[in-house]
């Protein structure tokens, strides 16, 4: 989840009184808003482990999937949120990432790598921001050290195993401290770890069990039982227990055992109502619901939310097993539809599948397989309520589909108000999914229902056809052959998704332009009897084709006909590869300036801020107003 974020325009001199006041008034009442999910392999239909996270920030915020190449020894990681610096003493590993647009980070291109897999098969989702309590903050405050801007880049660039990633991050916190408190999931083909930065210099990491699930919407004090002496399953800072005991602030469970979560986490009365709303929605989705009135109370004083009567567990047993890939993808789009009083569609409550989602990642881990092929990254670059997750063998990929807009695309379309008449930049799955989602959130009754049904049909076909691709991947024994297939499959999955979604978006625009809303919109490619696609995608066929294929010439897609008439819409052309952007040589030793990127010589960079500090911002806002707005403003991302 996002935290600190410098906005260039707001950092300049002369921010006015009116703007400063408006900024403060617009701040959310619940600043933290990301959701992390874990499902152990004993609970899934395919026997695989799943974990992932939804990042929330704003309604229209551009994200980019890409590949960071390896670098020679001497490469330096740095941050745009703190003074953190770390220089590698070895050749770094290639890894996939999901990053921000450089225009939002002082033109740095490495902003917040967030989620990916490296060439060793280590995956990471970072971060879920949490909060420490005031007692801990007084004795071990945050530092100018490591933070979420750099976590994923360092873990994926440096670690050959998940445990190695945990140990590296822990050692860096020991040395430099942290500038934010976060949870991170780090995994490989054998282990999945939950890492938590608890305070300025204290941390813990727990190897996750195969028979539990977890939903965490930024709550740092969810209960868990851990044996600090079990080094096989728990790693931690040296003074995790002795420091709070020496300071007289340690907390203990009923049986007298040192309680990490209650010692370090925020107090129950300090946790946000929107956080508990999402926790309740998540527990309901996974069929282990909390009971209204007994476990929680709905609060509505102008903002609908929930409060709980006592601290809840970090891990729980779902009410069923056999969870499917589709169900776990859709968990991130959950809007509390089955929770009376906390249904985002009816009651206006915050939701896991909020309109503020910017990116969702889900990692599917096949325990014991070769690290190169063990993990599949399911990636959504827009809001989960109306989006599609694309399967990617990211550990092997060395190139990225041109339908994923790279960081050279304009950020301007994010601010577009009339997306019916003003189309997104050409051949951009990022913007197409953003625009589909915006139209559905604005028109849930006329567009949302059938579009969701269509996207579900598309998602199911991607899942089913990926099984065929996966069989071929597992049959391939060489890294060279696997890499070629991973690149080809990534291109095929992305292109098929783009073409279906672009045609859908064009039909949605035509429906809106026609202005006849007597009948809800129905996509021409949706079979309303089977809720499947009329014309299947060709993902598996394209990925496994042996004959060379000549790509279409790029160009603007044809406009489809009347969406009321069944038929197959025209497909857009294949885009050109993005033009190269001058960059520094691969031997560069800092990420603060340009460096090579496999989509053209793209530069790279940066990350975030402490999400607990709404009150602090309000105080700072008074200073902004009284000083006429001359301040370095830092915008929150959640």
Kindly label every feature range from the protein language model.
Residues 621-638:
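C-terminal membrane-anchoring or membrane-association module
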Residues 540-609:
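C-terminal low-complexity, Ser/Thr- and acidic/Pro-rich disordered "stalk" regions positioned immediately N-terminal
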Residues 606-619:
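Juxtamembrane/start-of-transmembrane alpha-helix segments at the extracytoplasmic/lumenal side
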Residues 34-148, 168-305:
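A contiguous strand-loop segment
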Residues 21-31:
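C-terminal segment of classical bacterial N-terminal signal peptides
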Residues 2-17:
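Bacterial N-terminal signal peptides that target proteins for export
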Residues 299-409:
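Long, well-ordered mid-to-C-terminal structural blocks that present hydrophobic/aromatic surfaces
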Residues 381-388, 392-545:
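Charged low-complexity "KEKE/polyampholyte" interaction tracts
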